[in-house]
Every structure is written in structure tokens, then in C-alpha cells.
Amino acid sequence: SLITVLLATSYKQIGRLMFLFSLLTLIAILKGFWQKFIGFDAIEYDALMESGMYKTHLLPQITRYFSIFTDAGNYGSNMGFTCVLFGITGLFSKKPGLKTYYLCVSALSLYSMFTTGTRGAIVVPLGGLLLFALISKNIRLMSAATVGGICIYVFFAFTYAGESNYMIRRMRTAFRPNKDASYLVRKQNRQKLAEYLRDKPFGEGLGLGGVEARRFGNRLTTTIPNDSTYVKIWTETGIVGIILYLLIYAGSLLWGCYYIMFKVRNDELRHLLTALACGVFGMMLSAYGNAFFTQFPTGIMMIMFLGILMNGKYIDERLTIEKQQALLTATKKDSTL
């Protein structure tokens, strides 16, 4: 975050970073398509077998693709993030070519999100739409985002349209948790952890949460899978740790949203920061149902984008000065002529 604040100090730098990030996103999408239409390579297949990931990724009715990420949950949520990020960026881009490019990346990201079979990933674009409706300060955009979000929710929660498609059917279970056996098991596991951690305000200890930590010790917290980033942090650092963690991340996001709504004067920068804020908010919501938020590269990316949000006021002031200097230079040239 500190490095981002020190280096990402101009609108042009943020624009270049966004374009570079879109290229990396396309690489991830293409790799996901390769896995879907051609298949896993030998290294990926061996990794699935040796790590036990085949139990959650090679399902009877669907194969969950993970591209270049650690698992399908990480890949799916990141595709939801890039769908929101480049969708909003493309929507407000003034350059026709760049607008088309970003909107295409957004659409490909949305499709890739569905190929992962990650139910919690659908929360990312929905959460992004929700925040967009709140901070856009544009009645038409707020109305469109609200209507769009409601339509998506109604489609998944109250209809059976597209039920023959397994990807849609699997995503639909995220909106009907009480009918989902996986959700009920997670709920029971959290109740067990709550009872166990009642007298441990600082948790069980770093690295001692989740079944992947069995090699470090055999205890209750290493026998229960952490299917949520927040549950994992709560298990390892206790109620004190999770409160501090949420305060830092939520505070940073709220700080950025405050600047977007009331301080940033340049529209092009406001739209870019809005896209980042909406994407990060969606990821934070999705982290409740998936333990991906601290994994590579998601953890680094979220800290980096929050750093840009918190640096928004300085970037805006610098952009204003650059515009004034450009206008002054143009005026001098005109007077000389």
C-alpha cells in the first residue's frame, strides 16, 4: 500500500496501470479458455490429483476451471472483480476504441466467472452494482444500477429460467442458501468454532486455521475447513484480530468513497476510482463466502487498489494543476500568434 501511494501519483499512471491490468486479465481468461476447450496440461492435472483439489474441481456435472490462479474460487471472484472494474471504466471512457476494448474484457470476465462454478463469485458484480448506485450521484445511473441489480437477484432467487444450464443452476444455489447442503455444513462449522474460540480473544494462532494447517498441529481449528476469509482470520487471530482487520479494510474503502463523492473534481478520475471502489467492495463481500481474499495475487491487488483510492485526493489535485498549466500554455501560444 505504501509503495502504491508513493508511486501511483498521477492519472496517467493509473490509466497505464489499468491497461496493463487488462492485459494480465486477458492472459488469465485465455488460460481459462484453454483449460475449458483443450484441457488441463500434465502439470495442472498432477497438481489437482496430488493436492486433493480434484474433489472440489472435477465434479460429476461440471469441471471448475482455475486458469493461472490458486483455485477456482480465487479465479471466479477475480473475474467478477474485473467484470465490474472494466465494465464501469469502459462505460465512462471517452475514447471509442478503449471503451469497446474494456467492455469486451468485462464481458469475457463475466463469462469466465461462470465457468469457474464459484457460487460466491456472483456477489462481486452484485456488490459492485450496489455501491455504484450509492456513490454515482447520478439519478439515471443510480436507477439503472438499482434496476439491473434487482433483475439479476430476482432472476437467480425467484425464477428457474436457464435451470437446464448447470452453471446457472449452480450459481442459483448462492441465492437459496437454506436449500444448499454445503451452506448448512459451513453454518454448523462456524457454530463449533464460535464455541471453541469463546475464551480465545486472540484466536488459535497464525497458520493454525483450516485443514491445510494440519501439518502444523492437530487441533479442532485444523479439522474444520475455512470456507470464508473472515472466518479464517477470526480463527487465527480471534475477535480482536477480525475487528482490526475489518476496520482497516472497511475504513480504507469508506475513506476512498468519501473522496470520490465529495472531494474529487475531475470526472475522468472519479469514474476510474469509482470502478476500483465498486470492484473492491464486491470482493470484500464475496470474501465472506470464499477463503480467497488473502491468497496470491488477490491480497496484493486489493491492497494496491485501496492505496490508489486513498491517494485519490492527491491525484485529483495534481490532475487539476496539470490541466491549469496546459490551459495557461495554450493561452500564451494563442496570445503570441
Q: For the regions a protein language model found, what residue spans apply to each?
A:
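A membrane-periplasm/extracellular boundary helix in multi-pass inner-membrane enzymes
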Residues: 30, 35-40, 113-116, 133-177, ...
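A conserved mid-to-late transmembrane alpha helix and its immediate loop/hinge
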Residues: 66-67, 71-73, 109-112, 201, ...
